[in-house]
Amino acid sequence: MLEFLFISLLWLFKPIYFLLFTVMFSFLIFNNFSWGGLFLVLDSYSFILLIVMSLFILGIIVISEKNNNLLILSEILVFICIIFFIPSNMMMLYMFFELSMFPILVMILGYGSQIEKINSSYYLMFYAAFCSFPFLFVYFKSNFLLVFTYYNFVISWEMFFILSLSFMMKFPIYFLHLWLPKAHVEAPTTASMLLAGLLLKLGTAGFLRILGSLSFVHNNVWILIAFLGMILGSFCCVFQSDSKALAAYSSVTHMSFLLLSLVFITMSSKISSVMLMLAHGYTSTLMFYLIGEFYHTSGSRMIYFMSSFFSSSMIMGILFSVVFLSNSGVPPSLSFLSEFLVISNSMLISKSMFVMIFIYFVVSFYYSLFLITSSLMGKGYHNFNTWNVGFSAPLVLMMYNVFWLSVFY
């Protein structure tokens, strides 16, 4: 039903993208089906759902973005991300992983509004280069065997850490996260939507691919990194005055929570991590879309100036509240279901983990509620274009589409 709703929107606004959507969707109805010879293979429902999410995000960008150059860059980036989800060996995975950086860099440098965009591009390139060269080191040390390997290989703990460093940068985990707020603040709205909704999923999907090589003995290191990212990142959100920076740090906390789910290495933890990927993809895309609409109308991203802004439109206020409540994991959103599964898994492993997760949830709910109350209370503006906000309706439906569970169970 949701797919038909979205396709009807595409048919109404951009008929050529309706054709593109239907052609791509016809490829996605097959599971365990290789339509690219030895190089591309659909081997999991998880990656099929991520590809569907990519197409939904592209759809809202196609409908809402007026700049044709940004549209072309968005289509290139989504195509690269789709190919990233379905390669059959590590070398192709790495190639498309690095290739995804260039459209975002062009968007930031070409269409950013402030001179600080050069500094944020330096951060992005430095982190990408610093964290990706170790991957090439492992590649050469393996005597090029990674070219033909279908993800199931046995390596030492040290080699796994080096291999996962490039994916950790795209998560990003807390200590490799400094490029993300800078890139979000300087990027145009379209680039921020793609960066939060798609590019962060490349790191999680890549880590999910190599997870079979993770040593069970050293999980404590990853659990510690995940908890530090959750707690410190959520406290960073509390002290932000820029709404876009707050949404960026919120992505850092959610990705740390996702890392906690992944390293448990159980079937239910994999299911919860994929659902959390989907929930964060839809939610963060809408967060940056709404913040971008606020910026385009008022000329500011400061939370102080958001006071009463969304109360000028009832539809906008409801949508804003729904998105940020979903971001904090309120039922019946997909975020709640995935986070509930993560909490259940962590309680089975150690009761003491619940204290850390409780702190994370309290702080996370606080900054989401603070942003909602600060934006809805007070005297409202009257110059807001409500029509554009209606484009986000399909993503809201997907964000609360709890029937994703039926795919896994």
UniProtKB/Swiss-Prot annotation:
Effect of mutating F30C: In strain: PB306
Membrane-spanning ranges: 10-30, 44-64, 76-96, 98-118, 120-140, 160-180, 194-214, 221-241, 245-265, 271-291, 305-325, 353-373, 389-409
Organism domain of life: Eukaryota
Gene Ontology cellular component terms for the protein in this record: mitochondrial membrane; respiratory chain complex I
EC number: 7.1.1.2
Gene Ontology terms, MF aspect: NADH dehydrogenase (ubiquinone) activity; ubiquinone binding
Topology in the lipid bilayer: Multi-pass membrane protein
Pfam families, alphabetized: Proton_antipo_M
Uppermost EC category: translocase
Chief location: mitochondrion
Keyword entries, A-Z: Electron transport, Membrane, Mitochondrion, NAD, Respiratory chain, Translocase, Transmembrane, Transmembrane helix, Transport, Ubiquinone
One Gene Ontology biological process: aerobic respiration
UniProt subcellular location: Mitochondrion membrane
Substrates-to-products reaction catalysed: a ubiquinone + NADH + 5 H(+)(in) = a ubiquinol + NAD(+) + 4 H(+)(out)
Effect the entry attributes to changing W11G: In strain: AB1
Reported effect, G317S: In strain: PB303
Family to which the UniProt record says this protein belongs: Belongs to the complex I subunit 4 family.
Function noted in UniProt: Core subunit of the mitochondrial membrane respiratory chain NADH dehydrogenase (Complex I) that is believed to belong to the minimal assembly required for catalysis. Complex I functions in the transfer of electrons from NADH to the respiratory chain. The immediate electron acceptor for the enzyme is believed to be ubiquinone.
Protein name: NADH-ubiquinone oxidoreductase chain 4
Organism ancestry: Eukaryota, Metazoa, Ecdysozoa, Nematoda, Chromadorea
